[in-house]
Amino acid sequence: MATKVLDETPKGKPKISFLGMVLKPLNSEYGKVAPGWGTTPLMGFFMALFAIFLVTILEIYNSSVLLDGIAISW
């Protein structure tokens, strides 16, 4: 047989590092969700602004928007 499956699990204790101890408080809120919509409307507003920005850049690149006094030569 080319492969072998081992059913043994490691029996040692996990190592506790300094970095793990420092970062553990940041993970204490894992799984908790604030009730309600929270900042979702604000996020939607900024996503819409970003979409408008991207469309504007695309229109300038495609020369769909003519800019007076600015010579564009690609």
Curated annotation (Swiss-Prot):
Swiss-Prot/TrEMBL GO biological process terms: photosynthesis; protein stabilization
Membrane topology according to the record: Single-pass membrane protein
Record's subcellular location: Plastid, Chloroplast thylakoid membrane
Record organism: Adiantum capillus-veneris
Top-rank lineage group of the source organism: Eukaryota
Modified residues (Phosphothreonine): T3
GO annotations of cellular component type: chloroplast thylakoid membrane; photosystem II
Segments traversing the membrane: 41-61
Family: Belongs to the PsbH family.
An example molecular function term from Gene Ontology annotations: phosphate ion binding
Keyword Membrane among UniProt keywords: yes
PANTHER family in the cross-refs: PHOTOSYSTEM II REACTION CENTER PROTEIN H
NCBIfam families assigned to the protein according to its UniProt record, in alphabetical order: PRK02624.1
Modifications made to the protein after synthesis: Phosphorylation is a light-dependent reaction catalyzed by a membrane-bound kinase; phosphorylation occurs on Thr residue(s) in the N-terminus of the protein.
Protein name: Photosystem II reaction center protein H
Keyword terms, alphabetized: Chloroplast, Membrane, Phosphoprotein, Photosynthesis, Photosystem II, Plastid, Thylakoid, Transmembrane, Transmembrane helix
Stored InterPro entries: PSII_PsbH, PSII_PsbH_sf
Function per UniProt: One of the components of the core complex of photosystem II (PSII), required for its stability and/or assembly. PSII is a light-driven water:plastoquinone oxidoreductase that uses light energy to abstract electrons from H(2)O, generating O(2) and a proton gradient subsequently used for ATP formation. It consists of a core antenna complex that captures photons, and an electron transfer chain that converts photonic excitation into a charge separation.
First and last residue of the signal peptide: none
Main location group: plastid
Subunit and interaction comment: PSII is composed of 1 copy each of membrane proteins PsbA, PsbB, PsbC, PsbD, PsbE, PsbF, PsbH, PsbI, PsbJ, PsbK, PsbL, PsbM, PsbT, PsbX, PsbY, PsbZ, Psb30/Ycf12, at least 3 peripheral proteins of the oxygen-evolving complex and a large number of cofactors. It forms dimeric complexes.
